[in-house]
């Protein structure tokens, strides 16, 4: 992977944009507007995955991205804000944020730190014995939880490494039938979040 240009944005810029982002199907609702948002380094064993798998090819991309960032003097696991990347072979810039973690109090009173975005990066941190810097969001509206439940056991050994996702595989356990109503639209205030990261080397 070749990074042609990096533009760094501060923690202040990151949080300001997060407060302005909207829901995917309701552009008038801003789930993070009044939440407590901070950058924190949180140990992997304090984070709850909702996604029950990681893709091997995506892990490879994350590792390539980490190495490419290191060549430019940046740490994938400690961005201290966010970066806008121009990648060789990719037409539009891509915004790379720290993983997004949302605090949620479940029905049984358990407080869980759900991984909203950045599962493959968090899993990479797990493999590399790193305590990653994450975006930690607390105080969300109760009616706007993350769209899937966290895995109750919080057991990272249960996460399956896949080449392809089988048709019958349960990727996540959704909270509601129309789960897209609970999607956050990161691209309402950022550029191409989740876009190409390493389709070329």
Report the location of each language-model feature.
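Short, low-complexity, polar/charged sequence segments that are solvent-exposed and flexible
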Residues: 119-123, 134-136, 153-156
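Short alpha-helix boundary/capping and kink motifs at helix termini
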Residues: 1-7, 24-40, 44-114, 133
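ADP-ribosyltransferase catalytic core
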Residues: 130-142
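A structured, charge-rich N-terminal accessory region that forms the first stable segment of a protein
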Residues: 12, 17-29
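Amphipathic alpha-helical interaction segments
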Residues: 17, 40, 44, 56, ...
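Amphipathic, charge-rich alpha-helical segments that serve as recognition/docking helices
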Residues: 139-201
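A sequence-level detector for short glycine-anchored, His/Arg-bearing signature motifs
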Residues: 109-128
